[in-house]
Curated annotation (Swiss-Prot):
Protein name in UniProt: Uncharacterized HTH-type transcriptional regulator YdeE
SUPFAM superfamilies: Homeodomain-like, Probable bacterial effector-binding domain
Pfam families: GyrI-like, HTH_18
Organism of provenance: Bacillus subtilis (strain 168)
Keywords: Cytoplasm, DNA-binding, Transcription, Transcription regulation
Amino acid sequence: MDLLKSMNRALKYIEENLTNDIDFQEAAKLAFCSEYHFKRMFSFLAGISLSEYIRRRRLTLAAFELKDSNVKVIDIAIKYGYNSPDSFARAFQNLHGINPSKARFNGHSLKAYPRMTFQLTIKGGNEMNYRIEEKEAFRIVGIKKRVPIIFKGINPEIASMWESLDEKAINKLKELSNVAPSGLISASTNFSEGRTEENGELDHYIGAATTKRCPDNFSRLEVPASTWAVFESIGPFPDTLQEVWGRIYSEWFPSSNYEQIEGPEILWNEHKDVTSPSFKSEIWIPITKK
């Protein structure tokens, strides 16, 4: 409940500064968390990125102002953070489907995105199995690719990464594994802004957690010493896993005393048989106490 109140305080600050430069660090302070965690929590709770929410709100208010006043288009563009009439017109057209000058006349349909507030919804109260782990610094060694974000079903780009690993490479990675999570793992990091809108990208690794030197033919990701929240997922793949991932942000973080810090989100699978109805996975997320 306190988290929702603090998030709404941050939203109030953003709403009051839609015609100014928004200080995201100040918004995060009002939410009693880091800027990184604030943006991630907002995205998962709202279903869109913070920057996209701000863009929609500004263009909503701009449409109202165009409709209800005689203020010049260039003045409205500058007021809502656009440096030129052209950039404003493109953004306006993309959202509303018409150019700003036509919005002044009746008969045109415009989109409105109301101010957002977060409210508590009581759901089924299904348990979540998790543990907290402290880990020294290590590195993830393996193959790396920039891939699109996909919410539902199998990500074909990630599937192709797995297919590219021959038996020799898999055995080499398993030999490198000497710290938990053991064996082959996946890791996602460097998420783009569109993470929650399924139009962003991320850096995806398939490899091993290790303290050993990275061979020349593999990529590596250095991971600093961190505290990790480890969540268990048991059920049909990938639906159960994707459900747990969503609940981590919509349920666990809001009710915990932790916030996420920058670092990779790691996935460990018990075995390769994804057809098992009791497929077991673990999600590792780097955290810190608030």
